[in-house]
């Protein structure tokens, strides 16, 4: 509740992640910077998912909220349209933010109450069993970020059951070339056996085959996403080795729905019309 100049807002609330390992759901999506009408439709779709499934607890955004990160009027419009994600009873989904390449300047840090120098990358614990590590593909991958990443992964694995990472530019893209961070990040992902990597930026849909050491491996990591929260969708290249023979690509506005249980992580691409484009299950790793 907010109160200012004698005016009082309606009451809002959110739900925290369960501490006892109970099932819950996380929504992920990126690239809402353009296509404002479709951005609004996707916000309503997310709200509908949270209304129909009370286990949806939070929304992880993969970056590129707006076109120009230094323009407050664009942020103001994004924030206003984001209110469509509020449920009728006042429940809101906390945002776990990622910085995109269009989100330059300091307004991003002000909007999400992050320290400019220390919160470009951060870890969010969702209960005791799920950790989401957020990285910044706009900052150098080596040096402080790589050191921080390895320290986090070493601390979290095998302590948590599910270990996820999110960042903006893909390591195994379906449209563009790979992020320059791939030679630094991917070996650490492999070393500490993360479960899934959530990507944006390509404006398409993608699920790779499981990858380890730069090749297909059943023990490897699946990279999913590429961003469909409003932007026009691009045509992906389905002939890349990490997509053929078990992966999948497409073009449609979407979010990625992640359903966590003690034994399985169910990953679904949900389209604007509520249909599922892909439905994939990852089993918990044994240590």
Please report, for each region that a protein language model flagged, where it lies by residue.
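Acidic, histidine-bearing metal-coordination/catalytic regions of metal-dependent phosphoesterases
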Residues: 1-28, 33, 52, 251, ...
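Conserved, compact domain cores that house catalytic/ligand-binding motifs in diverse enzymes
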Residues: 22-98
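Structural motif
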Residues: 25, 58, 130-132, 162-164, ...
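Short acidic, glycine-rich surface-loop motifs adjacent to enzyme active sites
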Residues: 63-66, 156-175
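Histidine-centered catalytic micro-motifs
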Residues: 32, 164-171, 195-205
């Amino acid at each position: 509740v907010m109160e200012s100049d004698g005016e009082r807002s309606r009451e809002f609330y959110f739900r925290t992640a369960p501490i006892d390992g109970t099932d819950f759901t996380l929504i992920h999506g990126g690239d809402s910077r353009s296509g404002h009408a479709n951005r609004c439709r996707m916000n309503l779709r997310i709200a509908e998912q949270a209304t129909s499934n009370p286990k949806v607890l939070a929304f992880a955004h993969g970056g590129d909220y707006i076109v120009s990160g230094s323009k407050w009027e664009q942020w103001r419009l994004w924030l206003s349209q984001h209110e469509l994600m509020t449920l009728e009873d006042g429940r809101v989904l906390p945002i776990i933010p990622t910085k995109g390449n269009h989100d330059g300047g300091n307004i991003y840090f002000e909007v999400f109450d992050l320290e400019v120098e220390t919160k470009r990358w951060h870890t969010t614990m969702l209960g005791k069993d799920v950790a989401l590590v957020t990285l910044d593909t706009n900052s150098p991958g080596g040096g402080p970020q790589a050191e921080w990443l390895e320290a986090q992964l070493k601390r979290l694995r095998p302590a948590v059951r599910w270990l996820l990472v999110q960042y903006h530019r893909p390591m195994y893209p379906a449209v563009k070339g790979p992020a320059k961070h791939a030679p630094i990040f991917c070996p650490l992902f492999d070393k500490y056996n993360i479960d899934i990597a959530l990507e944006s930026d390509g404006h398409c849909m993608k699920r790779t085959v499981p990858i380890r050491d730069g090749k297909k491996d059943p023990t490897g990591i699946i990279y999913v996403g590429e961003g469909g929260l409003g932007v026009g969708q691009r045509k992906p290249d389905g002939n890349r080795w990490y997509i053929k023979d078990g992966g999948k690509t497409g073009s449609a506005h979407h979010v990625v729905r992640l359903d966590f249980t003690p034994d399985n992580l169910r990953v679904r691409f949900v389209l604007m019309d509520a249909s599922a484009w892909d439905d994939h299950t990852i089993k918990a790793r044994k240590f």
